[in-house]
Amino acid sequence: MTWIHLLFWLFFTLVGNAASAGDSIHTNGLDQEIAVSSGAASSTLINACWTADELRGRPDERKIRSHLPVDHNPPEQLAPSAPAQPLGPDLARSIRSVKPANDAKLVALTFDLCEQSNDITGYDGALVDLLRTEQVPATFYAGGRWMRSHPERTMQLMADPLFELGNHAWTHGNLRVLRGQDITDQIQWTQAQYEILRNQLLSRSCAAALPEAARSIPRLPATFRFPYGTCDASALAQVAAAGLYPIQWDVVTGDPAKGQSAQQIVRAVLNQVRPGSIVVAHANGRGWHTAEAMQTLVPALRKRGYRFVTVSDLLQAGAPVAVEACYEMRPGDNLKYDRLFGRGTE
């Protein structure tokens, strides 16, 4: 253990032993990927590589389209070029929130970009445009196949200093049902696709002209979100072995429900949010009324004194509150997804 790792160990050990939603654990050595994942890249990079019109969302992008034949093709490379540094076994747990030091009113907005092997799920440009206009940091959990089918949008999110990308598995596989190599592929193929697009971005002349800003883009995602919010001990262990922090949530927007209004989303979040909360929503065609809800939520949360941060910054601000299982709001409440979706990949 390096002296830096030791300092993190001492800090998180002293922060506290438990919180209402689970145990506070120490993240034994937050690596450099987390340390630079938010706010490090210069905003000049994104402005140099894309015009305002190219960054702006288009209404037709959000539409979900079927993809036939089903796409079972792997990425051009099957794993990232550098081996991951595995996390300790104490980190093979589902992080639901963070207990911030001094009860700081921090909240992490997270948006899933999931995609299976038989569809193309789109991009909610209105939502991303709003976050940029309001200067709201956010974390996007992108599936590997989503990144491959939306390469330009992926690179824009990657280059934006407001945002960070996390791993959301290759084709939204249910890691509580999948086993062994299938889980490895869901994780590593996504890491590899991120690296492919990062290298593609760095090869562009706009990035070559800004080497310091380009280098500050994280080499790989540092956090992972389980598709369907499902996991077991084996899946948690494989995610930690891949060097990724397993991130769940403690605030549910419910935006996949078509019948839920923006105002219902606003009420749900405001009723659930606490200092250190992680909010789950969607930034593709799977979310309904998400952008409209955020138009109200962002100023409402700021009025309550909350400051928006990425998941990586939230992890550095206190002790993660983690549990040994994955669930939506109560243990066992997502077991139905195993029956409904099985492997979950299409």
Predicted feature locations:
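N-terminal hydrophobic targeting signals that begin at the initiator methionine
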Residues: 1-3
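Bacterial N-terminal signal peptides
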Residues: 5-16
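N-terminal pre-catalytic segment of deacetylase/amide-hydrolase enzymes
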Residues: 17-111, 116-122, 154-155, 297, ...
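Active-site beta->alpha N-cap acidic-glycine motif
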Residues: 65-176, 182, 188-215, 220-221
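Catalytic domains of cell-wall/extracellular-matrix polysaccharide-remodeling enzymes
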Residues: 148-152, 170-307, 311-328
